[in-house]
Protein backbone atom coordinates (compact mmCIF):
# COMPACT_ATOMS: atom_id res chain seq x y z
CA UNK A 1 0.00 0.00 0.00
CA UNK A 2 2.83 2.45 0.77
CA UNK A 3 4.24 2.45 -2.81
CA UNK A 4 0.75 3.23 -4.12
CA UNK A 5 0.38 6.21 -1.78
CA UNK A 6 3.83 7.53 -2.74
CA UNK A 7 2.95 7.23 -6.43
CA UNK A 8 -0.38 8.93 -5.81
CA UNK A 9 1.32 11.90 -4.14
CA UNK A 10 4.08 12.05 -6.74
CA UNK A 11 1.85 12.30 -9.77
CA UNK A 12 -0.30 14.89 -8.03
CA UNK A 13 2.62 17.34 -8.36
CA UNK A 14 3.71 16.19 -11.82
CA UNK A 15 2.42 19.28 -13.67
CA UNK A 16 4.94 21.47 -11.83
CA UNK A 17 7.72 19.66 -13.68
CA UNK A 18 6.62 21.15 -17.01
CA UNK A 19 7.38 24.60 -18.30
CA UNK A 20 3.96 26.16 -18.85
CA UNK A 21 4.61 28.66 -21.69
CA UNK A 22 1.04 28.96 -23.01
CA UNK A 23 -1.70 27.74 -20.72
CA UNK A 24 -5.44 27.86 -21.32
CA UNK A 25 -8.05 27.03 -18.69
CA UNK A 26 -11.55 25.66 -19.26
CA UNK A 27 -14.44 24.64 -17.04
CA UNK A 28 -16.70 21.75 -17.98
CA UNK A 29 -19.35 19.35 -16.71
CA UNK A 30 -18.80 15.61 -17.24
CA UNK A 31 -21.79 13.29 -17.05
CA UNK A 32 -21.48 9.55 -17.46
CA UNK A 33 -22.88 6.09 -17.00
CA UNK A 34 -20.60 3.09 -16.39
CA UNK A 35 -22.20 -0.35 -16.43
CA UNK A 36 -20.78 -3.83 -15.98
CA UNK A 37 -22.68 -7.11 -16.27
CA UNK A 38 -21.24 -10.41 -15.10
CA UNK A 39 -22.67 -13.50 -16.80
CA UNK A 40 -20.57 -16.28 -15.28
CA UNK A 41 -17.58 -16.91 -13.03
CA UNK A 42 -15.24 -15.76 -15.82
CA UNK A 43 -17.16 -13.65 -18.35
CA UNK A 44 -18.81 -10.25 -18.32
CA UNK A 45 -19.63 -7.18 -20.41
CA UNK A 46 -18.74 -3.50 -19.92
CA UNK A 47 -20.44 -0.40 -21.32
CA UNK A 48 -19.73 3.32 -20.78
CA UNK A 49 -21.48 6.46 -22.02
CA UNK A 50 -20.17 10.01 -21.42
CA UNK A 51 -21.19 13.56 -22.30
CA UNK A 52 -18.96 16.60 -21.72
CA UNK A 53 -19.90 20.26 -21.92
CA UNK A 54 -17.81 22.99 -23.53
CA UNK A 55 -16.03 25.90 -21.84
CA UNK A 56 -17.60 27.76 -18.92
CA UNK A 57 -19.69 24.72 -18.01
CA UNK A 58 -22.78 25.28 -20.17
CA UNK A 59 -21.65 26.46 -23.62
CA UNK A 60 -22.83 23.46 -25.62
CA UNK A 61 -21.37 19.96 -25.94
CA UNK A 62 -17.67 19.28 -26.48
CA UNK A 63 -17.71 15.47 -26.58
CA UNK A 64 -19.99 12.45 -26.66
CA UNK A 65 -18.32 9.06 -26.24
CA UNK A 66 -19.13 5.42 -25.62
CA UNK A 67 -17.09 2.32 -24.81
CA UNK A 68 -18.02 -1.35 -25.02
CA UNK A 69 -16.01 -4.47 -24.32
CA UNK A 70 -15.78 -8.00 -22.99
CA UNK A 71 -14.42 -8.69 -19.51
CA UNK A 72 -12.69 -11.89 -18.36
CA UNK A 73 -12.43 -12.48 -14.60
CA UNK A 74 -9.23 -14.28 -13.66
CA UNK A 75 -10.50 -14.32 -10.08
CA UNK A 76 -12.53 -12.07 -7.78
CA UNK A 77 -9.73 -9.46 -7.66
CA UNK A 78 -8.17 -9.46 -11.14
CA UNK A 79 -9.85 -9.04 -14.51
CA UNK A 80 -8.83 -8.28 -18.07
CA UNK A 81 -10.87 -6.64 -20.80
CA UNK A 82 -10.80 -5.54 -24.43
CA UNK A 83 -13.15 -3.66 -26.71
CA UNK A 84 -13.95 -0.59 -28.79
CA UNK A 85 -14.25 3.11 -27.95
CA UNK A 86 -15.89 5.84 -30.05
CA UNK A 87 -15.83 9.59 -29.45
CA UNK A 88 -17.18 12.57 -31.35
CA UNK A 89 -15.53 15.75 -30.09
CA UNK A 90 -14.69 19.34 -30.90
CA UNK A 91 -10.88 19.57 -31.16
CA UNK A 92 -9.36 21.60 -28.36
CA UNK A 93 -7.33 23.79 -30.71
CA UNK A 94 -10.43 25.01 -32.52
CA UNK A 95 -13.38 27.07 -31.35
CA UNK A 96 -15.87 26.41 -34.15
CA UNK A 97 -18.26 23.47 -34.19
CA UNK A 98 -16.35 20.96 -36.29
CA UNK A 99 -16.63 17.53 -34.71
CA UNK A 100 -13.73 15.09 -34.99
CA UNK A 101 -14.53 11.39 -34.77
CA UNK A 102 -12.21 9.02 -32.95
CA UNK A 103 -12.13 5.22 -33.15
CA UNK A 104 -10.07 3.39 -30.55
CA UNK A 105 -9.33 -0.19 -29.64
CA UNK A 106 -8.48 -0.84 -25.99
CA UNK A 107 -7.07 -3.59 -23.78
CA UNK A 108 -7.00 -3.37 -19.99
CA UNK A 109 -6.00 -5.22 -16.86
CA UNK A 110 -7.40 -4.12 -13.50
CA UNK A 111 -7.00 -5.38 -9.97
CA UNK A 112 -8.45 -4.48 -6.58
CA UNK A 113 -7.66 -4.77 -2.87
CA UNK A 114 -10.69 -4.72 -0.59
CA UNK A 115 -10.48 -4.00 3.12
CA UNK A 116 -13.24 -3.27 5.65
CA UNK A 117 -13.10 0.51 5.15
CA UNK A 118 -10.81 0.95 2.17
CA UNK A 119 -10.98 -0.30 -1.41
CA UNK A 120 -8.02 0.30 -3.74
CA UNK A 121 -8.59 -0.20 -7.46
CA UNK A 122 -5.83 0.00 -10.07
CA UNK A 123 -5.87 -0.41 -13.84
CA UNK A 124 -3.54 -0.23 -16.81
CA UNK A 125 -4.96 0.34 -20.29
CA UNK A 126 -3.44 0.33 -23.78
CA UNK A 127 -5.25 2.23 -26.54
CA UNK A 128 -4.86 2.32 -30.33
CA UNK A 129 -6.31 5.68 -31.39
CA UNK A 130 -7.50 6.67 -34.89
CA UNK A 131 -8.52 10.34 -35.02
CA UNK A 132 -9.89 12.06 -38.12
CA UNK A 133 -7.52 14.54 -39.73
CA UNK A 134 -8.51 18.23 -39.68
CA UNK A 135 -7.91 20.75 -42.49
CA UNK A 136 -9.11 23.91 -40.77
CA UNK A 137 -11.60 25.21 -38.22
CA UNK A 138 -14.63 24.07 -40.22
CA UNK A 139 -13.52 21.12 -42.34
CA UNK A 140 -12.24 17.60 -41.78
CA UNK A 141 -9.53 16.09 -43.98
CA UNK A 142 -9.11 12.63 -45.46
CA UNK A 143 -7.84 9.75 -43.38
CA UNK A 144 -6.88 9.44 -39.75
CA UNK A 145 -3.94 10.20 -37.49
CA UNK A 146 -2.80 7.22 -35.42
CA UNK A 147 -1.00 6.84 -32.12
CA UNK A 148 -0.85 4.59 -29.07
CA UNK A 149 -1.71 5.76 -25.58
CA UNK A 150 -1.27 4.16 -22.16
CA UNK A 151 -3.29 4.96 -19.05
CA UNK A 152 -2.58 4.06 -15.44
CA UNK A 153 -5.25 4.72 -12.82
CA UNK A 154 -5.22 4.29 -9.04
CA UNK A 155 -8.39 4.90 -7.03
CA UNK A 156 -9.01 5.00 -3.28
CA UNK A 157 -12.54 4.43 -2.00
CA UNK A 158 -12.79 5.20 1.74
CA UNK A 159 -15.95 4.24 3.60
CA UNK A 160 -17.31 6.96 5.91
CA UNK A 161 -20.29 5.19 7.50
CA UNK A 162 -20.38 2.81 10.44
CA UNK A 163 -21.22 0.02 7.98
CA UNK A 164 -19.26 1.15 4.92
CA UNK A 165 -20.25 0.41 1.32
CA UNK A 166 -23.81 -0.53 2.23
CA UNK A 167 -26.94 1.09 0.70
CA UNK A 168 -27.55 4.75 1.59
CA UNK A 169 -23.99 5.40 2.81
CA UNK A 170 -21.24 7.76 1.66
CA UNK A 171 -17.60 7.07 0.82
CA UNK A 172 -14.78 9.46 -0.08
CA UNK A 173 -13.21 8.85 -3.49
CA UNK A 174 -9.79 9.97 -4.76
CA UNK A 175 -8.06 8.92 -7.95
CA UNK A 176 -5.15 9.85 -10.18
CA UNK A 177 -4.66 8.82 -13.79
CA UNK A 178 -1.57 9.34 -15.98
CA UNK A 179 -1.72 9.28 -19.80
CA UNK A 180 1.30 8.75 -22.07
CA UNK A 181 1.35 8.93 -25.89
CA UNK A 182 3.71 7.08 -28.20
CA UNK A 183 3.96 6.33 -31.91
CA UNK A 184 5.52 7.75 -35.08
CA UNK A 185 3.25 10.80 -35.15
CA UNK A 186 3.96 11.82 -31.56
CA UNK A 187 6.65 14.56 -31.56
CA UNK A 188 6.23 16.77 -28.49
CA UNK A 189 3.53 15.43 -26.21
CA UNK A 190 4.71 12.02 -25.05
CA UNK A 191 3.23 13.11 -21.77
CA UNK A 192 -0.44 13.52 -22.64
CA UNK A 193 -2.23 14.41 -19.42
CA UNK A 194 -2.74 13.90 -15.73
CA UNK A 195 -6.17 13.66 -14.13
CA UNK A 196 -6.91 13.99 -10.43
CA UNK A 197 -10.34 13.53 -8.89
CA UNK A 198 -11.73 14.10 -5.40
CA UNK A 199 -15.31 13.56 -4.38
CA UNK A 200 -17.85 11.19 -2.91
CA UNK A 201 -19.55 7.93 -3.73
CA UNK A 202 -23.14 7.40 -2.61
CA UNK A 203 -24.24 3.75 -2.52
CA UNK A 204 -27.83 3.64 -3.76
CA UNK A 205 -28.26 -0.14 -3.76
CA UNK A 206 -25.87 -3.08 -3.78
CA UNK A 207 -25.74 -2.73 -7.59
CA UNK A 208 -25.89 1.05 -8.09
CA UNK A 209 -23.68 3.96 -7.02
CA UNK A 210 -23.58 7.69 -7.69
CA UNK A 211 -20.11 9.24 -7.86
CA UNK A 212 -19.72 13.03 -7.86
CA UNK A 213 -16.95 15.54 -7.26
CA UNK A 214 -14.23 17.76 -8.73
CA UNK A 215 -11.93 16.71 -11.56
CA UNK A 216 -8.68 18.47 -12.49
CA UNK A 217 -6.80 17.69 -15.70
CA UNK A 218 -3.43 19.02 -16.83
CA UNK A 219 -2.62 18.30 -20.49
CA UNK A 220 0.19 18.99 -22.93
CA UNK A 221 -1.15 19.59 -26.45
CA UNK A 222 0.37 18.39 -29.72
CA UNK A 223 2.18 21.73 -30.07
CA UNK A 224 4.94 21.36 -27.53
CA UNK A 225 4.67 24.72 -25.78
CA UNK A 226 0.90 24.67 -25.22
CA UNK A 227 -0.82 23.31 -22.13
CA UNK A 228 -4.37 23.04 -20.92
CA UNK A 229 -5.90 23.16 -17.44
CA UNK A 230 -9.35 21.63 -17.07
CA UNK A 231 -11.64 22.10 -14.08
CA UNK A 232 -14.74 19.92 -14.23
CA UNK A 233 -17.74 18.88 -12.20
CA UNK A 234 -17.87 15.11 -12.67
CA UNK A 235 -21.08 13.13 -12.00
CA UNK A 236 -21.20 9.42 -12.86
CA UNK A 237 -23.80 6.71 -12.33
CA UNK A 238 -22.15 3.32 -11.76
CA UNK A 239 -24.09 0.10 -12.21
CA UNK A 240 -22.78 -3.43 -11.64
CA UNK A 241 -25.06 -6.43 -12.01
CA UNK A 242 -24.12 -10.03 -11.23
CA UNK A 243 -26.29 -12.39 -13.30
CA UNK A 244 -24.76 -15.58 -11.98
CA UNK A 245 -27.22 -18.03 -10.46
CA UNK A 246 -26.97 -18.09 -6.72
CA UNK A 247 -26.33 -21.41 -5.01
CA UNK A 248 -29.71 -21.41 -3.30
CA UNK A 249 -31.41 -24.17 -5.24
CA UNK A 250 -29.13 -26.93 -3.99
CA UNK A 251 -29.25 -25.57 -0.46
CA UNK A 252 -33.03 -25.48 -0.55
CA UNK A 253 -33.18 -29.00 -1.96
CA UNK A 254 -30.90 -30.28 0.81
CA UNK A 255 -33.09 -28.50 3.37
CA UNK A 256 -36.21 -30.09 1.87
CA UNK A 257 -34.62 -33.55 1.93
CA UNK A 258 -33.50 -33.05 5.53
CA UNK A 259 -36.95 -31.80 6.50
CA UNK A 260 -38.64 -34.76 4.77
CA UNK A 261 -36.28 -37.21 6.46
CA UNK A 262 -36.92 -35.73 9.88
CA UNK A 263 -40.67 -35.79 9.27
CA UNK A 264 -40.50 -39.46 8.24
CA UNK A 265 -38.48 -40.33 11.35
CA UNK A 266 -41.03 -38.63 13.57
CA UNK A 267 -43.85 -40.51 11.82
CA UNK A 268 -42.09 -43.89 12.25
CA UNK A 269 -41.42 -43.15 15.91
CA UNK A 270 -45.09 -42.31 16.43
CA UNK A 271 -46.16 -45.56 14.77
CA UNK A 272 -43.73 -47.59 16.89
CA UNK A 273 -45.01 -46.01 20.09
CA UNK A 274 -48.61 -46.70 19.07
CA UNK A 275 -47.92 -50.38 18.30
CA UNK A 276 -45.91 -50.81 21.50
CA UNK A 277 -48.71 -49.23 23.54
CA UNK A 278 -51.29 -51.56 21.93
CA UNK A 279 -49.11 -54.63 22.64
CA UNK A 280 -48.61 -53.66 26.26
CA UNK A 281 -52.32 -53.01 26.76
CA UNK A 282 -53.26 -56.41 25.32
CA UNK A 283 -50.74 -58.77 26.91
CA UNK A 284 -49.66 -57.17 30.17
PLM regions and their residue ranges:
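Start-of-domain marker
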Residues: 21-83, 87-90
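Residues on the lipid-exposed face of transmembrane beta-strands in outer-membrane beta-barrel proteins
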Residues: 33-37, 68-72, 107-111, 152-162, ...
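Outer-membrane beta-barrel transmembrane domain signature
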Residues: 125-209, 218
Amino acid sequence: MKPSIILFLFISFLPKCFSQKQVTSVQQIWLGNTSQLRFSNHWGFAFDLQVRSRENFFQGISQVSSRIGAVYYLNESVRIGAGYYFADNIPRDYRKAVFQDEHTGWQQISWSNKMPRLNINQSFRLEERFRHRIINETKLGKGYNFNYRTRYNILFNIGLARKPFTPHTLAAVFYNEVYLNFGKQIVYNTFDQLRAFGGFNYTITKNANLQFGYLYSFQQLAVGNRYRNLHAVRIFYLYNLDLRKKKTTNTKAMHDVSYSGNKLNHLNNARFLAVNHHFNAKYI
